[in-house]
From Swiss-Prot:
Enzyme Commission number(s) from the entry: 4.2.3.-
The protein's name: Probable sesquiterpene synthase
Cofactor(s) the protein requires to work: Mg(2+); Mn(2+)
Keywords, ordered alphabetically: Lyase, Magnesium, Manganese, Metal-binding
Organism: Santalum album (White sandalwood)
The record's free-text note on cofactor binding: Binds 3 Mg(2+) or Mn(2+) ions per subunit.
Cysteines paired by S-S bonds: none
Alphabetical list of InterPro entries matching this protein: Isoprenoid_synthase_dom_sf, Terpene_cyclase_plant_C1, Terpene_synth_N, Terpene_synth_N_sf, Terpene_synthase-like, Terpene_synthase_metal-bd, Terpenoid_cyclase/PrenylTrfase
Length: 559
């Protein structure tokens, strides 16, 4: 049955249809990123030599702090915040293991163990690197009634570090929930009285907590903060700036290659109703992994990302139900012969999907990882079937219960799809067992999907309601529970808190899959927090998104 083809005569001839066209804004970038001038080879080689020399210097300095936990923690923190921790993964792992064993397992006091900043930094570094340390370490900063002591009120630096640490909380840690409320309220009240750079750090953290930010983007912000501290490590800062510029050139070359491929497809002409968001998509992918060793992985996922963005718009911004049934069936068949069954406007997209997957399949075959293609195809089929369900709801003007909506909307968030595709180019670490784990829909995946869906609905439901889109989660929740929009928002915010705690829990040891695979899920979730913080920054590209893209792909660091 699966390989039978619908006769051509059954393809409906549809004229003068009322289509749900969204009138998405065009790309703001034009051909800006197509042309890339390669850096002078001698100049690049010289910078690479400098980077290697500075890396050795930083390694020596890190090794010299082995018996100075606080100093060691500060170097590790700076290295991670400046975006160069990928050069020192083994050294950082060994250092944190040493700190964990000597200060937590053996309960040995360390310099600064009675200082809020030092303890909060210790807690955050260990938690964000997977160590299951207890929040009871903060008991010493609370009075007999369980409130945080009054003498902390003036310790803005310590409060800021505690605030950052609270974002790594898991379920059952009411102390950290209280600490978040306490530190947030206090920092908001004192920020206008602080001096630079602490004032800037507090403002930024209140807007974008470190744990939910994109590492590469947070590094851009942290450069100027770190440099403003008189005690900053000059070798570390220079290394970070040189490395940033080298990587930026590398990313611009990648984007240039992808942009030429994208232009050759001519989707702007062939599928003009869809969002043209290649550059924004590449920014999204950089949020998932920016490190040079993931170049192949980025090239795979960005091509698939552009395809799925276009398919999404075919389903909810142009296609009729009858046309979409044909496309859904064509994806199920996964056969070039299905092209003849599709309306003309669908053919370029379907043909391109098959071509992209064939490219990926060839690469996987070369790596001896052909088994991955089964997962890549299955997750695409499931996503498209979810789009079809939503299209039927929209056509029928059906408002599902919130639970029914979420059962489909978690799939159409695209985050299981993107996670699956993000694993394809990651080498041997992405084993069959890892894909089976992913397809078992573990809590961390459901939590990531929830963040994606809830934040998307909160930021885009008004625009989508105006253009006749399927009812969003906000509308479904309001109708089912007879609540106001504000009350629905409050419930969504509570669910977001729960989802982040689920993610934090899954990122603690022992890991179910290797940590690099978990990091893709965490980073995909972070992308949503950044792009959808105040608006749908992917669909409607405004100043915040433009500035973020410019900081990663246009503006170099001054060394």
């Amino acid at each position: 049955m699966e390989n039978q083809k619908m006769p051509i005569s059954s393809v409906p001839i549809l004229k003068d249809l009322s289509r749900p066209i969204a009138n998405f804004p065009p790309s703001i970038w034009g051909d800006r990123f197509i042309n890339y001038t390669c850096q002078d080879e001698n100049e690049r080689a010289q910078k690479e030599r400098q980077v290697e020399e500075l890396k050795e210097q930083v390694r020596r300095e890190l090794a010299a702090t082995v018996d100075k936990p606080l100093q060691q923690q500060n170097i590790i923190d700076a290295t991670q915040r400046l975006g160069i921790a990928y050069h020192f993964e083994n050294e950082i792992e060994e250092s944190l293991e040493h700190i964990y064993l000597h200060t937590y397992v053996e309960n040995t006091c360390f310099e600064g163990s009675d200082d809020l900043y030092s303890v909060a930094l210790w807690f955050r570094l260990l938690r964000q690197n997977g160590y299951r340390v207890s929040c009871d370490v903060f008991n010493k900063f609370r009075d007999n009634e369980g409130n945080f002591k009054n003498n902390l009120m003036e310790d803005a630096k310590g409060l800021l570090e505690l605030y950052e640490a609270t974002h790594l909380s898991v379920h059952g840690e009411e102390m950290l929930d209280d600490a978040l409320e306490f530190t947030k309220t206090r920092l908001e009240s004192v920020v206008s009285h602080l001096n630079y750079p602490l004032a800037e750090q507090v403002r930024h953290a209140l807007y974008q907590p470190l744990h939910k930010g994109l590492p590469r983007l947070e590094a851009v912000y942290f450069f100027r903060i770190y440099e403003a501290h008189a005690s900053h490590n000059k070798a570390l800062l220079k290394l970070a700036k040189l490395d940033f510029n080298l990587l930026q050139s590398f990313h611009k070359k990648e984007l240039s290659d992808i942009a030429r491929w994208w232009k050759s497809l001519d989707f702007a002409t062939k599928v003009p109703f869809a969002r043209d968001r290649l550059v924004e998509g590449y920014f999204w992918v950089l949020g998932v992994y920016f490190e040079p060793q993931y170049s192949l992985a980025r090239k795979i996922i960005i091509k698939v990302f552009t395809m799925i963005s276009t398919i999404d718009d075919i389903y909810d911004a142009y296609g009729t139900v009858d046309e979409l049934k044909l496309f859904t069936e064509a994806i199920r068949r996964w056969d070039v012969g299905s092209l003849d069954q599709l309306p003309e406007y669908m053919k370029p997209c379907y043909k391109s999907i098959l071509e992209v997957y064939n490219e990926i399949e060839e690469e996987m075959d070369n790596q001896g990882s052909l088994f991955r293609m089964h997962y890549a195809k299955e997750v695409m089929k499931k996503l498209v079937e979810g789009y079809m369900d939503e299209a039927k709801w929209c056509h029928e003007k059906y408002v599902p219960t919130f639970e029914e909506y979420m059962s489909v909307a978690l799939v159409t968030s695209g985050y299981t799809f993107l996670t699956t595709m993000s694993y394809l180019g990651m080498g041997e670490i992405a084993s069959k067992e890892a894909f089976d784990w992913l397809f078992s829909h573990p809590p961390v995946i459901e939590a990531s999907e929830s963040v994606g869906r809830l934040m998307d609905d909160m930021r885009s439901h008004k625009f989508e309601r105006e253009r006749g889109h399927v009812a969003s989660g906000i509308e479904c929740y309001m109708k089912q529970y007879s609540v106001t929009e504000e009350e629905a928002y409050d419930e969504f915010c509570k669910r977001l808190v729960k989802a982040w705690k689920d993610i934090n829990e899954e990122c603690l040891r022992p890991y179910h899959v290797p940590k690099p695979l978990l990091m893709r899920i965490l980073n995909l979730t972070r992308v949503i927090d950044v792009i959808y913080k105040n608006e749908d920054g992917y669909t409607h590209v405004k100043k915040a998104m433009k500035d973020n893209i410019a900081s990663l792909l246009i503006d170099p660091m001054i060394v």
